[in-house]
Swiss-Prot record:
Belongs to the PAL/histidase family. It comes from Lithospermum erythrorhizon (Purple gromwell). It holds the Pfam family Lyase_aromatic. Homotetramer. InterPro entries: Aromatic_Lyase, Fumarase/histidase_N, L-Aspartase-like, Phe/His_NH3-lyase_AS, Phe_NH3-lyase, Phe_NH3-lyase_shielding_dom_sf. GO terms for biological process: cinnamic acid biosynthetic process; L-phenylalanine catabolic process. Its EC number is 4.3.1.24. This is Phenylalanine ammonia-lyase 1. GO terms for cellular component: cytoplasm.
Amino acid sequence: METIVENGNGKTMEFCMKDPLNWEMASESMKGSHLDEVKNMVAEFRKPVVQLAGKTLTIGQVAAIAARDDGVTVELAEAAREGVKASSDWVMDSMNKGTDSYGVTTGFGATSHRRTKQGGALQKELIRFLNAGIFGNGTETSHTLPHSATRAAMLVRINTLLQGYSGIRFEILEAITKFLNTNITPCLPLRGTITASGDLVPLSYIAGLLTGRPNSKAVGPTGEKINAEEAFRLAGISTGFFELQPKEGLALVNGTAVGSGMASMVLYEANILAVLSEVISAIFAEVMNGKPEFTDHLTHKLKHHPGQIEAAAIMEHILDGSGYVKAAQKLHEMDPLQKPKQDRYALRTSPQWLGPQIEVIRSATKMIEREINSVNDNPLIDVSRNKALHGGNFQGTPIGVAMDNTRLAIASIGKLLFAQFSELVNDYYNNGLPSNLTGSRNPSLDYGFKGAEIAMASYCSELQFLANPVTNHVQSAEQHNQDVNSLGLISSRKTSEAVEILKLMSSSFLVALFQAVDLRHIEENVRLAVKNTVSQVAKRTLTTGVNGELHPSRFSEKDLLRVVDREYVFAYADDPCLTTYPLMQKLRETLVGHALDNGENEKDVNTSIFHKIAIFEEELKAILPKEVENARASVENGIPAISNRIEECRSYPLYKFVREELGTELLTGEKVRSPGEELDKVFTAMCEGKLVDPLLACLEAWNGAPLPIC
């Protein structure tokens, strides 16, 4: 079997013969659960060192370099030096021998028919004409690529060039690494690339800094704007600006690193948000008194889709043993024929809805992970066969397609969250929670999450618009040479916007869910107080007659307590004895029913139940409002009769983080604090990555499998 010699290092490899189509490798990469993959991603993100060798770069590592500008360093594998040098030497040798190679002795793109022997000057001109970006006089940051994305691009480009197929000196890669490690970031234009032939325009600004172009700018370690000379000094690069050798300019700019770097950042966030959406859906089921049957493993196994099966299993894990589920089961057992047999789609089909989105995001992650470990410039230098291969690996189609698909998945997740949020704040659907999740004693002066619901509609609308594909808007470019192009970075940028909006929606929904958790806590304590009060008043007023004899009305107590169990607390809590509210109406109806069944006894004032109704109501009105207020005050003062059920649930780590560590609280119209202030706390924490640990803590005990079918 013919073997291929790896460039310059003398070792043989059989990667062209073993698994020649790479489907086996792609299949192997999808083994295991999505959650395990996310955990590994987070672990990679938190490592203090990223070791680059060209073939093992991960999404988590790229995200770490992008976000952690002072907590992680990059190290280059010394073993790669020989291969890099071999391809660089080959270019110089071939140039000296008069070999005709694209971008080395020829012009570029549609003008590649031009020829020159001035290889260094050609590279210099390449960088000059590609410096075509617009920054708005350097003051408008909205036209500058985020520095995090630039750092990601630098890392990915180094990784590609380390593989030794690009014809560039190792010293240039070391210089870019020093920029990363000293937190010096070149300023790249936000727009201007079609990611085929690579990200030419933005990458040319990295090359411009390396070559000391006078228009090159960078941002220093403390955020200050610096020129190329200052950048080299701060980075400790003492060799001076680089004079590019033949092919080196092309090696720097002719790649997909900006698009794939930003895509890596986006996918790190998207994967975490996908897991969060699964946990959020389970919490939604808890506070909505949902039926957990929708997570049963057999249902999902029969559908076959792994994303759906895992989403259901994760929700099942959260709901297993949940106090809310147990309480809801008792609730559903009362008058079952008068209630819907099953929950609405936003709850009941959430695994079926989220599953495909998780599969899409996971597939996109693998696609981008392959891309950031690829050699994606042109021509490729094959030292072993003594030739330059002219192809099109610079075409960033995997990025554009992966990002379009990811953005559509993100929009679908957002749509589900909006549907769930809309049910949660609507008292027609939310099984007894107050309208708008108002937390005040006076609902007429508290409109709770009404503003947040409007904002959620806005977020969702923008997210649905962003779901439109980018890749079908290709324009023929560069004298019709680049007549099809990937638009990879544009799609990555739009997906980054979508991720930000999904964070806005997720943080808003989390605050609303935990408002609902606290309202359920109030509900449970108030119901207990009402039940005890009704029982006590019934015993005092309905048990005996005027002369102490047992009275027929004593048999009504059980039915009166059943009324309390059935009625929604927040339908009467602001004024429990108001006769137009359902509690007093139903209590009276119950006593009237007993009176009608009392027959001849009603003719005797001593045995009449009708005569007892007024006495019962009068005493209840004298006591109940105070008891309801005491119950609510006890919850607010941290001494409730019944503890908050969330404390025993697997979703508690998220609740605890949002309430205790972020310092959020139950929102009411009586307080000055606005919903936006609380939402901001959660959103900021989410952007800073602080939500990851409590999120994963909710699933710490999950063994990666559904509950057994019994």
